[in-house]
């Protein structure tokens, strides 16, 4: 009998964290790319039902605009990966995880981080899905 879920065969946790960050949400930027606060304007690879607001969770890539940060970064449209969310989600072992804030890391369209360090913890789901983010993270929860 085959294993359940696509993630089970790749060696990553096949958990799908709760999508708790809708379009329009403000996120704290947890790296040193120059942006401080971003606003979500779209979710990459989100296929929802009609007229439903797209939402994202830990490990998802979003399209966002920079609201606060260095003058050369402000008002730019960037891609980011969500590494923390306040809404709790359940892992397969029964543990429930939630963080103090909603945070993201600015990345290139290929998923390579634009900063060189990440402040604060990174969810394990995001670190396993985006290996380059996991390699520069100081704390993985």
Swiss-Prot record:
<dbReference type="InterPro" id="IPR000218">
    <property type="entry name" value="Ribosomal_uL14"/>
</dbReference>
<keyword id="KW-0689">Ribosomal protein</keyword>
<dbReference type="Pfam" id="PF00238">
    <property type="entry name" value="Ribosomal_L14"/>
</dbReference>
<keyword id="KW-0699">rRNA-binding</keyword>
<dbReference type="GO" id="GO:0003735">
    <property type="term" value="F:structural constituent of ribosome"/>
</dbReference>
<comment type="subunit">
    <text>Part of the 50S ribosomal subunit. Forms a cluster with proteins L3 and L24e, part of which may contact the 16S rRNA in 2 intersubunit bridges.</text>
</comment>
<dbReference type="InterPro" id="IPR036853">
    <property type="entry name" value="Ribosomal_uL14_sf"/>
</dbReference>
<comment type="function">
    <text>Binds to 23S rRNA. Forms part of two intersubunit bridges in the 70S ribosome.</text>
</comment>
<comment type="similarity">
    <text>Belongs to the universal ribosomal protein uL14 family.</text>
</comment>
<keyword id="KW-0694">RNA-binding</keyword>
<dbReference type="InterPro" id="IPR019971">
    <property type="entry name" value="Ribosomal_uL14_arc"/>
</dbReference>
<keyword id="KW-0687">Ribonucleoprotein</keyword>
<dbReference type="GO" id="GO:0006412">
    <property type="term" value="P:translation"/>
</dbReference>
<protein>
    <recommendedName>
        <fullName>Large ribosomal subunit protein uL14</fullName>
    </recommendedName>
</protein>
<dbReference type="GO" id="GO:0070180">
    <property type="term" value="F:large ribosomal subunit rRNA binding"/>
</dbReference>
<dbReference type="InterPro" id="IPR019972">
    <property type="entry name" value="Ribosomal_uL14_CS"/>
</dbReference>
<dbReference type="GO" id="GO:0022625">
    <property type="term" value="C:cytosolic large ribosomal subunit"/>
</dbReference>
